[in-house]
Amino acid sequence: MALYHFHVEQIKRSEGRTAVASAAYRAGEKLHNLWDGETHDYTRKGGVILSEIMLPEYAPERLFDRYTLWNEVEQIEKHYKAQLAYSFDMALRNEFFLEENIALAREFVQKYFVSDGMICDLAVHQPDREDGGIPNPHFHVLVPIRPLNADGTWGAKQHRVYHLDKDGNRIKKEDGSWAFDAVPTTNWGKPETLDLWRKAWADMVNARLEEKGLVCRIDHRSYVDQGLDLIPTIHEGPHVRKMEKKGIRTEKGELNRWIKATNRMIRSIQA
């Protein structure tokens, strides 16, 4: 069984992160953030093979510009702890040619993200060598959490669903305000949606592997659900990954290297 990687996290101001900085890093560009006045220059970053913005058909053309897109996101989110974007990263296959990997990433993003109204900033990376000399092709997708309305304007992240009594009247809380639940306007953050995406990506990759006559497959399920006695790696986070890419060894990085080596040994014993 080939290795599977599909990770998603939120870009949050509460963690000291910005959408503009995240976009600049993934695209290998220099972008200025109007919200905080910071400029982020990643033009020396290697391994960025492709970067492009994919939009739903009703999105305004100005959002094809990365600087415009992410500065609009920064400006419309007023709260100092705002949740700005979803960040996806997914492993591509060394068994495929570069052009095949790019086509696969585009197809998945269009079919499962853009068609559902998501604005997608896609970047395909192919670093020279990582993790002991193993090529590591992968792609990133940065998506604003706030959706677009059908008229191309920015929509709401949530809407209120008021609590009602048996007669259908709104219920007040002790402080006199109406009781309500804040319900997301999209299903993008739901666990079941993530499960659907994870399986869809595995199915799409496996279909390509079969078309090429290759016997290896990937599995989106956890090791436990697969019935494998393997150790899951721990989440490193952007700061640890940045240090590791600079050649700075970290405790989390060392632990994951040990886990990967142990799992290789377990797989060889079970084979």
Question: Where is each model-derived feature located?
Answer:
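N-terminal nicking endonuclease/strand-transfer module with a His-rich metal-binding environment
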Residues: 1-271
